[in-house]
Amino acid sequence: MGSIGAVSMEFCFDVFKELKVHHANENIFYSPFTIISALAMVYLGAKDSTRTQINKVVRFDKLPGFGDSVEAQCGTSVNVHSSLRDILNQITKPNDVYSFSLASRLYAEETYPILPEYLQCVKELYRGGLESINFQTAADQARGLINSWVESQTNGMIKNVLQPSSVDSQTAMVLVNAIVFKGLWEKAFKDEDTQAIPFRVTEQESKPVQMMYQIGLFKVASMASEKMKILELPFASGTMSMWVLLPDEVSGLEQLETTISFEKMTEWISSNIMEERRIKVYLPRMKMEEKYNLTSVLMAMGITDLFSSSANLSGISSAGSLKISQAAHAAYAEIYEAGREVIGSAEAGADATSVSEEFRVDHPFLYCIKHNLTNSILFFGRCISP
């Protein structure tokens, strides 16, 4: 392991393992990469065991350039943060085929003095930074201000990232992190081909969903031993793809969840396993939106000091008692028909009779949206019911 892609994938599955515990039989959707970049903002100012724990969970020391002698004034290898920043800049750069809206910020109770050098570093490296706010005597108003900021940064898509009563007069610092994604496929699904088809939630229960359909050349793989198959659906521009991991059986998701790991995923999506074939693809139209308080998840993973009185954030504030009271995360994405190239009806019609292989996503599955250049997992999800 030695790349941001590998680090994000390892972290992704560690988070998933914990989220599964708290959200049995529910849809799950989150952005491992942006959680890492949010924790990196904290890591900049963390010291001693607080810093060690974050590093152990996120594995910053596995990144190229981690131990370089060129130290930033923030006391952390610049390369780690600049490589995260470069990917963030790359994916959030405005273009006509996909859009990312990111809101990531620390909010500290205003009575804590914040070190100017920390503010400078976090602004340079993460464009977001830290705001001081009045939790002590106006907690609900502070919550409203934070929610409004996130809503405006995400074009109105993510509302109320902080739930009522999630902050109070004792709140020291809150980490908020929210991301929205909309993208065009390389090959569009035609609107008129979308129709209501039953999605089998369990062996006994099904519900109608809007099922998109197309025939085309796609990279696909069947894993007989794992009883599942994988499909890659490229977004326009080729820098990102959605990967769908579909169990063979309606009830096969649990086995897949138990099996999946960084090593397995790397093996499954490798070029010597995936092969391009002409297939019929059925994929539900989906709107994914989930919000999490990641405090318990990160604590279960081993970041405990950060959320307790043992926190050492002396690189952020000279006040010894600063800690994080809550880490809020929200992710939103839409999967719909729009794409860059539309395949003509005549071409598709001629294919329909000659193509027999199907990839029919009509029962629970796992999926991820991956940045192909760096192999970073931008989003990971479980769909029990679209």
Curated annotation (Swiss-Prot):
Q: Which PROSITE patterns match?
A: SERPIN
Q: How is it modified after translation?
A: The signal sequence is not cleaved. The functional signal for membrane translocation of ovalbumin becomes accessible when the nascent chain is 50 to 60 residues long. The hydrophobic sequence which lies between residues 27 and 43 folds back on the preceding residues to form an amphipathic hairpin structure which is the signal element recognized by the membrane.
Among the GO molecular function terms of this UniProt record, one is: serine-type endopeptidase inhibitor activity
From the UniProt annotation, give the residues forming the signal peptide.
Answer: 22-48
Positions modified as Phosphoserine? 69, 345
Which residues carry the site feature described as Reactive bond homolog? 353-354
Pfam families the record matches: Serpin (PF00079)
Q: Which UniProt keywords apply?
A: Acetylation, Disulfide bond, Glycoprotein, Phosphoprotein, Secreted, Signal
**Location in the cell:** Secreted
GO cellular component terms, alphabetically, are: extracellular space
Major subcellular location class: secreted
Please report any disulfide bonds recorded for this protein chain, giving both cysteine positions.
Answer: 74-121
On tissue specificity, the annotation reads:
Major protein of egg white.
Q: N-acetylglycine (modified residue): where? A: 2
**Superkingdom of this entry's organism?**
Eukaryota
Positions annotated as glycosylated? 293, 312, 372
Q: What family is reported?
A: Belongs to the serpin family. Ov-serpin subfamily.
Q: Which PANTHER family does this UniProt record tie to the protein?
A: SERINE PROTEASE INHIBITOR, SERPIN, SERPIN B4
Main role? Storage protein of egg white. Lack protease inhibitory activity.
- Name of the protein this chain belongs to: Ovalbumin
Native source species:
Meleagris gallopavo
Name of the encoding gene? SERPINB14
